[in-house]
């Protein structure tokens, strides 16, 4: 089976790290003035930041957040089990689109843990076309909209939902 896998929020806990650091940035640096939706876990939807504030947050914190993120619980064991069962594991991720260094950080984390994948698609804006091209049987992603778009191509998806997200 060909299995497509996202990185952030699926393999690495970077989404939680981003949310925590964004809360601190908003509270400490922006004086807690920019919250649009308190119960919204996605940084891009939670805050009413200006374009400049978004860029400042990205410039200051994206790389550090990426470095301090950890593997999700049991993900290494599951990935190794899938590999041993003969499945093809294909990374399909947006990582590296905004900050190129984030790709190298993920590659280093994978190498350190001995995690190998059959193919890598970095900096992807949309994932559905790659899933079709690679004949993906199942795509694992934490973005609900990605799952819907991929499912429209008659590809099974596993929505790896963070407990804080309501979709």
Question: Where in the sequence are the language-model features?
Answer:
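Short phosphate-binding/catalytic loops that engage adenosine nucleotides
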Residues: 87, 115, 155
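Substrate-recognition "cap/lid" segment bordering the active-site pocket of phosphatases
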Residues: 94-138, 143-148
């Amino acid at each position: 089976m060909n299995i497509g896998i996202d990185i952030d929020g699926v393999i690495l806990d970077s989404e939680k790290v981003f949310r925590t650091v964004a809360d601190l940035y908003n509270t400490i640096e922006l004086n807690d003035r920019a919250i649009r939706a308190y119960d919204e876990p996605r940084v891009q939807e939670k805050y009413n930041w200006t374009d400049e504030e978004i860029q400042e947050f990205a410039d200051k914190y994206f790389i550090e957040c990426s470095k301090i993120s950890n593997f999700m619980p049991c993900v290494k064991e599951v990935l190794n089990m899938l590999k041993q069962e003969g499945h093809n594991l294909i990374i399909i991720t947006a990582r590296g689109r905004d900050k190129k260094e984030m790709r190298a950080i993920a590659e280093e984390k994978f190498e350190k843990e001995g995690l190998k994948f059959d193919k890598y698609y970095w900096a992807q804006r949309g994932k559905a076309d790659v899933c079709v091209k690679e004949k993906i049987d199942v795509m694992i992603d934490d973005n609900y909209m990605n799952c819907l778009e991929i499912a429209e191509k008659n590809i099974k998806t596993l929505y790896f939902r963070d407990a804080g997200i309501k979709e």
